[in-house]
């Protein structure tokens, strides 16, 4: 897997692909395979949903995926295929509607590890200050850990290691599973999350392994080889492998008449170029 050798200090990581190029889909797929993500300039103006749909069609992603958490009656307001992410004081969603930062997570709190393979974020309007999307190459960090401390890495593979619970008011649901796993193709996948949704079972795996593993990963999130801040400009999209990267958000400030506005779509397929 190329992403295991990625170095986020390389400025080519954030070199955007022009979606108008005839070979843009191949460029995007190549960047995603190499780095886990691709930045895309969507030059043509139009409704955000239409721009994301054009991008997802070019990448053969299929229809947007609705996460399991949003299939409950109490969460139906968040079940749209395209989710608006902007500050809204009357909204109770702990991530979409606040200007606060978001700590490392993967999308799909209740979904099986590797189920949601792709996230697209499209920028309608950038924040006045802050609001960068943070990316963490958790797979590469895990590969380094596995070389240095096999017992710690084994603890992260335990099916009891990580429980994630909903923090949406009134929705008492949770899911337990490994932090890393190997999919049917033999590739590493992740659900590394380290935020207020998490409960860790330190008895999982070899004694002391999970604590050492978390110490290692938390240190790795500050390593510039693995950590990157991406500030999207209006009309840009970020395509990333939700099953191979963890992500977060810097806190931000809005102007009263110009709120930061991103639109998100999730997919169960990985990007593929046309034959």
From Swiss-Prot:
<comment type="function">
    <text>Dioxygenase involved in the biosynthesis of the capuramycin-type nucleoside antibiotic A-102395. Catalyzes the dephosphorylation and oxidation of UMP to generate uridine-5'-aldehyde. Can also use the alternative alpha-keto acids pyruvate and alpha-ketoadipate (2-oxoadipate), with very low efficiency. Cannot use alpha-ketobutyrate, alpha-ketovalerate and oxaloacetate.</text>
</comment>
<keyword id="KW-0223">Dioxygenase</keyword>
<dbReference type="InterPro" id="IPR003819">
    <property type="entry name" value="TauD/TfdA-like"/>
</dbReference>
<dbReference type="InterPro" id="IPR042098">
    <property type="entry name" value="TauD-like_sf"/>
</dbReference>
<feature type="binding site">
    <location>
        <position position="107"/>
    </location>
    <ligand>
        <name>Fe cation</name>
    </ligand>
</feature>
<dbReference type="InterPro" id="IPR050411">
    <property type="entry name" value="AlphaKG_dependent_hydroxylases"/>
</dbReference>
<keyword id="KW-0479">Metal-binding</keyword>
<keyword id="KW-0408">Iron</keyword>
<dbReference type="GO" id="GO:0017000">
    <property type="term" value="P:antibiotic biosynthetic process"/>
</dbReference>
<protein>
    <recommendedName>
        <fullName>Uridine-5'-phosphate dioxygenase</fullName>
        <ecNumber>1.14.11.49</ecNumber>
    </recommendedName>
</protein>
<keyword id="KW-0560">Oxidoreductase</keyword>
<dbReference type="GO" id="GO:0051213">
    <property type="term" value="F:dioxygenase activity"/>
</dbReference>
<dbReference type="Pfam" id="PF02668">
    <property type="entry name" value="TauD"/>
</dbReference>
<dbReference type="GO" id="GO:0046872">
    <property type="term" value="F:metal ion binding"/>
</dbReference>
<comment type="pathway">
    <text>Antibiotic biosynthesis.</text>
</comment>
<keyword id="KW-0045">Antibiotic biosynthesis</keyword>
<feature type="binding site">
    <location>
        <position position="247"/>
    </location>
    <ligand>
        <name>Fe cation</name>
    </ligand>
</feature>
<feature type="binding site">
    <location>
        <position position="105"/>
    </location>
    <ligand>
        <name>Fe cation</name>
    </ligand>
</feature>
């Amino acid at each position: 897997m190329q992403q295991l050798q990625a170095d986020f200090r390389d400025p080519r990581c954030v070199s955007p692909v022009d979606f108008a190029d005839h070979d843009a889909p191949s460029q995007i797929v190549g960047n995603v395979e190499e780095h886990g993500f691709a930045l895309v300039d969507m030059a043509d103006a139009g409704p955000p949903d239409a721009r994301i749909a054009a991008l997802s069609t070019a990448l053969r992603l299929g229809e947007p995926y609705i996460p399991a958490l949003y299939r409950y009656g109490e969460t139906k307001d968040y079940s749209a295929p395209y989710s608006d992410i902007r500050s809204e004081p009357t909204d109770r969603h702990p991530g979409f509607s606040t200007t606060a930062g978001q700590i490392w997570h993967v999308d799909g709190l209740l979904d099986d590890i590797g189920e949601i393979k792709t996230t697209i974020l499209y920028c309608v309007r950038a924040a006045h200050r802050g609001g960068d999307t943070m990316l963490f190459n958790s797979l590469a960090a895990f590969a380094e850990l596995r070389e240095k401390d096999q017992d710690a890495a084994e603890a992260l593979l335990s099916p009891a290691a990580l429980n994630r619970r909903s923090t949406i008011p009134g929705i008492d649901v949770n899911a337990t599973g490994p932090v890393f796993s190997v999919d049917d193709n033999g590739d590493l996948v992740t659900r590394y999350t380290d935020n207020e949704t998490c409960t860790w079972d330190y008895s999982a795996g070899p004694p002391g392994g999970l604590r050492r593993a978390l110490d290692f990963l938390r240190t790795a999130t500050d390593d510039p080889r693995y950590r990157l801040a991406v500030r999207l400009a209006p009309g840009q999209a970020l395509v990333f492998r939700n099953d191979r990267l963890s992500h977060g958000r810097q806190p931000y400030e809005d102007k009263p008449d110009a709120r930061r506005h991103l639109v998100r779509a999730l997919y169960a397929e990985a990007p593929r170029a046309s034959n």
